[in-house]
Amino acid sequence: MKLKQVRLGIHTIELYARKLKYHQIQKTIDHLVDQGSIQQIYSDSYSIDRHLKSTYLVARGIRMRLHQSHNKSNGISFAVNPSTLLTGAYQPLALYQPTKENVVEMQSHLADMFEEIHLSDHEMPILAPDELSLSRMDLTVDLWFSKDTDLSSLIRIFRKSMLPRHYKHRELEGKQDYFFELATKEISFKVYDKIYELEQNDRCPKKYRKERILRLEVSMRREAFLEKLGLKRKDDLFAMLKMGYDNVCAAISEFLDKLFPAGGMHLPYPEAERKIQQSKLDSAIKEQMLFLLKKTSRGAGLDTAAQKWKETYSVVDIRKFHALMKQFDKLQVNPVTLTSREQQGIPCLCLSNENVSKRAPKK
């Protein structure tokens, strides 16, 4: 397994048109019905409040969700793949790097599309693209590995990692070897086999089918990125996207640090066990390390193992856990191990600036 290349950028953004009137959004719905490109996903029993979605603009990189209500605000969210929108052709692996010029160009395309979907009153536009609110951005890193890499082993490592406080696992049934996600209401972190995902949707170009690409993605909703990136609500779209792009590595690294509190090699379980047993560490420390190693390997993951370790050894001070992680680091062993059938260790993932710059594609 060899990491060949690291690409980073923004995959998707979501722009929201809010405070629309009922009749304004109805014009757009009528047009999408005429085009045979709208689907209702929710309606109350009186059809007072309903949610719809449309793929009418998907070839140009936009998916729409529409919310229409008699007694609440009406709005449309536009999930935009900037790379596809700007080039006019589907870009399965391109990641967007914002500039002032391409943000203006993107907004120009959006203005044309508002007219096309009849988002207007008396032939006049009802809003300008710069009035849209940025409601989400997906900060993304693609790790391109050599073709002998088993990505399912890497994803398994994430499944065995430390679950951060306030986060919950999200599962895709039958996709455990290809997908990992943890989330709160405002932030999600995903790790998945990008080529597998493209193939499942029959959207993988032939030239990429043998590639091994692990995608790491932090998706932040508005309140999260305003707080974490130090942005103001009045900041324009370029300022927000530029700040997001500049913080891709930091956002991903923050999750990696939480998931993997020790930075040693992920070794096959028997080898990790042997290194601890043969070390010159205190026997009581070795006992606790082996306990944690075993529980992590056989259980749900490092967070569950840590809880059992605290109960078994009557640990109250959380600093003792971090001290134990330092003992793992001394041996260059990670408590999250590979299965016994795997032959080679895997370095703990690290997105240092040096690591990224060395493997960034040449411009």
Spans of model-derived segments:
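Helix-turn-helix DNA-binding segment
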Residues: 318-321
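Residue-level detection of the helix-turn-helix DNA-binding "recognition helix"
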Residues: 326-330
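Structured, helix-rich domain cores that form ligand/interaction pockets
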Residues: 1-308, 312, 331-363
